[in-house]
A protein has these predicted regions:
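Solvent-exposed, charged helical/coil patches
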Residues: 1-33, 79, 101, 109
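Basic, amphipathic alpha-helical patches used to engage nucleic acids or provide basic targeting signals
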Residues: 10-14, 38-107
Length: 109
């Protein structure tokens, strides 16, 4: 079951790193979707043509049970043929254009 309502809400409340990366990804010749629902999950960004999902990870992804939850989620997505790229939020803040270029290069492989 897709979580469209959650995706809509997340589009309205994107974090600063997500906004910065979206500004870069929306200007490339590949189509990216932001806050895209896939089954029970919502990907920060998704390139359907390349089947690549992008997650911008803040510090919370390193704490408590979150790393395990991320592994389970990534495994579920991989089983459906979606490659997952996890990008630290601090890297996006440092250079959103460099991060976007790396993602685009991966999508073109």
């Amino acid at each position: 079951m897709h979580n469209y309502a959650k995706a809509r809400q997340l589009r309205r409340t994107m974090s600063l790193p997500e906004v910065l990366l979206w500004q870069e990804l929306r200007n490339v010749d590949l189509k990216f979707r932001r806050q895209h629902p896939v089954g029970p999950f919502v990907l920060d960004f998704y390139c359907a043509a390349a089947k690549v999902g992008v997650e911008v990870d803040g510090i919370a992804h390193e704490m408590g049970e979150q790393p395990h939850k991320d592994e389970v989620r990534d495994g579920w997505l991989r089983q459906r043929g979606i490659r997952i790229v996890r990008v630290p939020a601090v890297e996006v803040l440092r250079s959103a254009s460099d991060v976007a270029a790396s993602i685009v290069a991966l999508c073109r492989r």
